[in-house]
Amino acid sequence: IHVKSSNIKPLKISKKFFVSCQDEFPLMFAISCLLPGISVFRGIEDLANKESNRIKEMGKILKQIGIKFFASKDEMRIYGNPYLKIKNKKINVSGIFDHRILMSAAILSLLTGINSKLKNFEQVGTSCPNFLSTIFKLVGRFEREN
């Protein structure tokens, strides 16, 4: 295959799309942080009823790293910042056991260079048992705290 870069645009996702890939929305929220412009996700009310309230939990993460967003029960708007400054920022996720939120926080940390502390990370094995080994192959670095 040949891969070429192009102008990346913000995501505009409707409820119709949500039905077929709702588990990927936390990751799309994370990626949207670095896209220029405003990404809009509509019809996402069911995210509040997953292993955690994924709208609320991703909002907490976005707030920690200084990403502007608007969230309601059925919509999320993320004001992306491709020039995000990482100094003095850290992603902390604790008290939840949602594998999708934990994976999305880890990937956001890798994309931005922001350090993260993710408790209950073993929950990632629920949907992706090889997640850490895959990240290691992609030059990610994780340290386990005791």
Give the role of each language-model region:
Residues 1-146:
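Short, structured segments at the rim of ligand-binding sites
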